[in-house]
Design a protein with these regions (language model features):
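Nucleotide-sugar donor-binding patch of glycosyltransferase catalytic domains
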Residues: 44-45, 76-152
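General structural signal for secondary-structure boundaries
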Residues: 1-2, 137
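Donor-binding and catalytic core of enzymes assembling or modifying cell-surface/extracellular glycoconjugates
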Residues: 2-88
Length: 153
């Protein structure tokens, strides 16, 4: 959810320990400006890089935070530590980023949402599951990022 991801960005940005880079397509510029506009260390790169430039930058990251998306897989293939957020899908369905620790896969609450995974591809969202990602607390995400970065530095 947008409000919870904004809280993650704020928590990470205010430490001034990190530079946050937001990746996206040109049609996502406005959506990503929502996260970066009031933050000192957060930069919206949507629409500013060629694909080759984006790959080069991803390959040099210390960590990639991503939903279950293509960027998680790209980063993992470059050996970048990847923390992923999972809604109605589950990494055991076969879409976990390559060679990443399961501890870096932050899952929606499967007790509260026992039908997860609702489909292999996440296309099916049962009634009442629309907010399942709200069970992944912003502080949990920040704590995991801090733990991973502390381990690799």
């Amino acid at each position: 959810p947008k409000d919870l991801m904004l809280e993650v960005v704020r928590l990470l940005d205010k430490t001034e320990n990190y530079t946050l880079l937001l990746f996206g397509a040109p049609n996502e510029i406005d959506a990503l400006n929502f996260f970066s506009s009031a933050q000192k260390n957060t930069h919206n790169l949507a629409g500013k890089l060629t694909f080759a430039e984006e790959l080069q930058l991803i390959s040099s990251l210390d960590l990639m935070l991503s939903m279950d998306s293509g960027n998680a897989h790209l980063a993992a293939n470059f050996g970048v530590e990847t923390v992923t957020l999972w809604g109605v899908t589950h990494p055991y369905a076969g879409f976990a980023p390559f060679c990443q620790s399961m501890e870096n896969a932050l899952l929606s609450d499967r007790v509260r949402y026992p039908q997860i995974p609702t489909s292999v591809f996440g296309k099916t969202v049962p009634k009442g599951y629309e907010d399942c990602m709200r069970t992944i607390e912003p502080q949990l995400i920040v704590d995991r990022i801090n733990m991973v970065l502390d381990i690799i530095q």
